[in-house]
């Protein structure tokens, strides 16, 4: 089969190492085998390796592979999952031995260009610090309304390789959500259109700094049409240096020529048309400025491949917000509880908090090198209280002490976290739980403490500004845990006097 696909025929009979036995790693196995490659998968998780073995791959625990350093040089290619940092020992060893390293998205691109599963698709790439999933799902809804065979894939839906292999029905366009991790390992990708929604501090521990993070995001702009959020300082700064054939901006205000924007209550296109109305701004979900920005980006990508205005309107009208994205959970005792667990960095938490007049903020987790001072300064006037949990809770507490000292703060701590001695003076109350308290029980305490700080008319908002993996399996697990805990409240839990 590989002789028919000249771009990858060099892999026939060659040994390829897949780094990571998760979803993206498993999706790599079958295409590599279709190309005639000899596939070995490595991971620390023996159960995941067993699943890969059932798919026909050889497997080796990563510690065993690292112990046999010379063995890595025997591979013709390493295809890495996005979870591996550039300085991971395995990848450093491969690079030192001169072994090419591709991410799963890079491999997907080459597979598609080589025609392994039919003529190449049109890739519509979405990236940004926040709003990627919402924008991609909006885009997919628009493509469906246009009756264009398409699939949402990448960080949303299914791996890109699985989308390429799906032939019944065959997707002609792919709505591809990509993270900075995936783009870092995908230097060859040239999308039909690619969008950067916004860029703020996130994943700096993985990238090693802000500029490498920006550089990774900018790889979405290397195709035919680049789409940039002009209301975002960092994203808009990339406009003049965009290597795309055509660069289009979008903004919340009235659009200039070459832009999409909002005018007289409508999303308006002055990039691919002369001021054509695309859809009413009212009714976009999720509501608010962030939702409108996502809708404009999705519309721009769709318009870049000729989707008509009526399909944009129909797709946005049909769009349903995914879970854990500013979702209303319940109202208890006059207090509204909102799950925005998807707000995994300070930039994402900001609009979630500012959407409400008075907020008891639930925050904490893994900050991933991001700073919260700017966020706290901006939202301080809205805060009726804060309840903090997770590994980096004290960093948020310290920021509250500096910029919102009048805001009552509760810290819910377990294990080693309870031994932190430098508790900021704003901490009105500390709750110290046994080290073996499970995450759902911790969230139950957090929600009760938040209810205690709230009064009728307030909103308790889970907008953690941090990743979840220090305590929860995912942001979805964290949001579900919050929802379950809210379900156990009654009106008597609201506005208790702090102990």
Curated annotation (Swiss-Prot):
| Biological process, per Gene Ontology | cell division; cell wall organization; peptidoglycan biosynthetic process; regulation of cell shape
The primary site where this protein sits is cytoplasm
Q: E.C. number, please? A: 6.3.2.9
* Keyword terms, alphabetized: ATP-binding, Cell cycle, Cell division, Cell shape, Cell wall biogenesis/degradation, Cytoplasm, Ligase, Nucleotide-binding, Peptidoglycan synthesis
Record's keyword annotation contains Oxidoreductase: no
Q: In which pathway does it act?
A: Cell wall biogenesis; peptidoglycan biosynthesis
GO cellular component, as recorded: cytoplasm
> Where would you find this protein in the cell?
Cytoplasm
Q: Which InterPro entries does this entry report, sorted A to Z?
A: AlaDH/PNT_NAD(H)-bd, Mur-like_cat_sf, Mur_ligase_C_dom_sf, Mur_ligase_cen, MurD
UniProt-recorded Gene Ontology molecular function terms: ATP binding; UDP-N-acetylmuramoylalanine-D-glutamate ligase activity
Q: Reaction catalysed by this chain?
A: UDP-N-acetyl-alpha-D-muramoyl-L-alanine + D-glutamate + ATP = UDP-N-acetyl-alpha-D-muramoyl-L-alanyl-D-glutamate + ADP + phosphate + H(+)
> Which parts pass through the membrane?
none
User: What family is reported?
Assistant: Belongs to the MurCDEF family.
Q: What is the purpose of this protein?
A: Cell wall formation. Catalyzes the addition of glutamate to the nucleotide precursor UDP-N-acetylmuramoyl-L-alanine (UMA).
Q: What is this protein called?
A: UDP-N-acetylmuramoylalanine--D-glutamate ligase
């Amino acid at each position: 089969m590989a002789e028919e696909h000249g771009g990858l025929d060099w892999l026939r009979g060659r040994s390829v190492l897949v780094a990571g036995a998760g979803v993206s790693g498993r999706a790599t196995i079958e295409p590599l085998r279709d190309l005639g490659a000899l596939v070995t998968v490595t991971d620390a998780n023996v159960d995941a390796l067993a699943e890969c073995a059932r798919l026909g791959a050889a497997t080796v625990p990563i510690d065993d592979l690292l112990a046999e350093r010379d063995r890595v040089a025997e591979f013709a290619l390493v295809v890495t999952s996005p979870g591996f940092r550039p300085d991971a020992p395995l990848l450093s060893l491969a690079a030192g031995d001169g072994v090419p390293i591709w991410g799963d998205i890079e491999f997907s691109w080459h597979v598609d260009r080589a025609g392994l599963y039919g003529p190449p698709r049109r890739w519509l790439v979405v990236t940004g610090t926040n709003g990627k999933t919402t924008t991609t799902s909006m885009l997919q809804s628009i493509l469906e309304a246009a009756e264009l065979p398409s699939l949402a894939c990448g960080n949303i839906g299914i791996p890109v390789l699985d989308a390429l292999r799906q032939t019944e029905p065959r997707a002609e366009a792919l709505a591809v959500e990509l993270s900075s991790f995936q783009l870092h390992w995908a230097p060859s990708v040239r999308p039909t259109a690619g969008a950067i929604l916004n860029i703020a501090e996130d994943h700096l521990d993985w990238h090693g700094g802000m500029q490498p993070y920006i550089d990774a995001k900018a790889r979405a702009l290397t195709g035919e049409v680049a789409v940039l959020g002009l209301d975002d300082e960092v994203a808009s700064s990339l406009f003049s240096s965009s290597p795309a054939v055509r660069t289009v901006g979008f903004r919340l205000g009235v659009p200039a020529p070459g832009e999409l924007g909002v005018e007289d209550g409508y999303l308006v296109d002055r990039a691919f048309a002369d001021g054509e109305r695309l859809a009413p701004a009212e009714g976009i979900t999720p509501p608010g400025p962030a939702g409108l920005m996502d809708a404009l980006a999705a519309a721009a990508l769709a318009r870049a491949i000729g989707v008509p205005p009526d399909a944009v309107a129909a797709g946005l009208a049909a769009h349903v917000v995914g879970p854990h994205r500013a979702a209303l959970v319940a109202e208890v005792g006059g207090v509204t509880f909102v799950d925005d667990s998807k707000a995994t960095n300070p930039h994402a938490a900001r609009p979630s908090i500012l959407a409400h007049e008075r907020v008891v903020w639930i925050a904490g987790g893994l900050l991933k090198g991001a700073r919260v001072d700017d966020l706290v300064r901006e939202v301080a006037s809205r805060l009726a209280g804060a309840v903090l949990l997770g590994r980096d809770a004290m960093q948020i507490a310290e920021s509250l002490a500096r910029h919102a000292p009048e805001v009552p703060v509760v810290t819910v701590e377990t294990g080693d976290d309870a031994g932190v001695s430098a508790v900021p003076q704003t901490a009105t109350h500390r709750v110290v739980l046994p080290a073996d308290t499970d995450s759902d029980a911790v969230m139950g305490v957090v929600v009760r403490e938040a209810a205690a700080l709230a009064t009728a008319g307030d909103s308790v908002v889970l907008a953690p500004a941090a990743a979840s993996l220090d305590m929860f399996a995912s942001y979805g697990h964290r949001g579900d845990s919050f929802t379950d805990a809210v379900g156990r409240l009654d009106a008597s839990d609201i506005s208790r006097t702090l102990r």
